[in-house]
Amino acid sequence: RVVAGESAMSDDRSQFIGGSDVAAILGISPWKSPYQLYLEKIGASVEDATQEKQRIFARGKRLEPVVVEMLIDELEHRGHEAGIINRNARYADHERRFLRSEIDLELLLDGEHVNGEMKTVHPFAAKEWGEPGSDDIPLHYAAQCMHGLMVTGRRLCIVAALIGAD
């Protein structure tokens, strides 16, 4: 079903559709329109990576291990058996190689291999998330999760969000 961790897997995002592209394709991304994504994919436009955007992205990457640790702690506190299988692994759909996904966290949760997405959220965006413990997440993140499930062939994705770490 999937091809994992190929060293030949290109980092050239114009060559594939990744999880973060899906919301733009569906027209539900708060950051990018379908047309903007199209222009990036054909090389007619380059994503504007401002210093502020790079700083926010880097902070999220630094905090990701903390979010993982908090998630594992919460799952175990709730009586689940949870173990980390992999972090930031890249996958390509075997039949549709243009579909790729990088999974933040892979867990063995109560014996099932599941995907995990770690998010750090600005306090002003907290209203987009449901009550703690609910299944309410922003639609653009749900699309990313569904894409990852499709590419990996798994059936469950856990999203952990650290809200207000700014």
What positions do the PLM features span?
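Generic structural marker for isolated residues within well-ordered, non-membrane alpha-helices
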Residues: 35, 68, 145
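Intrinsically disordered, low-complexity boundary segments flanking structured domains
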Residues: 23-25, 66-70, 157-159
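Charged, glycine-rich intrinsically disordered N-terminal tails and low-complexity linkers that flank
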Residues: 1-62
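Short glycine-rich, polar/acidic loop-and-turn segments at beta strand-coil junctions
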Residues: 42-44, 65, 69, 88-91, ...
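Nucleic-acid endo/exonuclease domains
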Residues: 52-56, 61, 65-69, 75, ...
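Nucleic-acid nuclease catalytic cores
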Residues: 73-103, 107-166
